[in-house]
Amino acid sequence: MSPDKLTIKTKLAFGVGATGEGATNWIFAGLTFFFYNQVLGLSGSLTGLAVLIAIIFDAVSDPIMGSISDRFISKLGRRHPFMFAAPFPTVIAIYLMFFPPDGLSEYGLFGWLIFSTILLRLSITLFAVPHLALGAELSDDYFERSRVMSYNNLFGYMGVIIMHIFVWFLIFPYFAGEKIGQLYQESYTPIAIFSMALISLCILSSAYFTKDRIPYLKQPSPNESHIKITDLFKDIYGAITNRNYARLLVGMFFLSMLIGTHETLGIYMGTFFWELSPIQIGWLIINNIIGYAFGFILTAKLHQRFDKPIVIVATVLGLTIFWSASANLALLGFAPERGSWELVMMIICLGSVASACGSILHIS
């Protein structure tokens, strides 16, 4: 079989790694801010600052990790050693994040959050950057790579869906008492344990079951194989001075602001703005399932019919409009009663369109 023609097994093995990455990102974006702010009592400004610092470290580490991986030489190639190593610091970071020492002052808790979130972002970068590069190297065929990234996108969202269902249907309703479940510190213990097991299994499975593709992967030339600090900075400078990449970077910056704000405030919106129960918040995952499915099915076809820039611009507009549509309708007085199942249905319908746009955009 031609190296360009990939088996379903390879596509599935590559994709399952994104499940671990998706679960990690869901933990970071969906729970961390709320846990430290509403459960542990850290002020919103300090919580936000800690998360910002971690994201800045993440932004710097991504190109450095890419440059190191591009130049790395080993019997396992230049991607797989990092993919195999990533689960261990990731698990440690999640444990530290959800089990801070007792008796910390507010600034002590602030420092602990900074340390644990930086470690988490750096750890998942250790997997995500080589894994993404691996996807681009699995085949030289453009449409085959689009299919590979469709699997990656689908499995990434599966990580989100699995964590969402586990947390909102099984954990938070179980711990509900005088307060809603998400406000009890004890409810986050099983979440941390489950996420650590899921992330480790998915990342290690992806690394193990794609290692048979190593002989087909590109290797660095002898001149590129030496890792030097100066080369790392040259790579970063070369990237940011590339006009097309700079435009893409600016676009990704604003898109990341949109996505990060939406994901971080999602638990606040469901709990305090919409006044939904944990079960009702759990059912909101339907919009993601519908949207991800349509994105998985349609993306390759859209790429065959339209240029990528057209697809990207259209889906960004759709994502922006429909993600905020429910809240805008509520503020204008056109939404169903808060806490009602009619409201849940409206959020699901509008959110499905937004999720489809986001899924297509992510793959593109």
Identify the function of each model-found stretch.
Residues 1-364:
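Membrane-embedded alpha-helical bundles of multi-pass transporters/translocases
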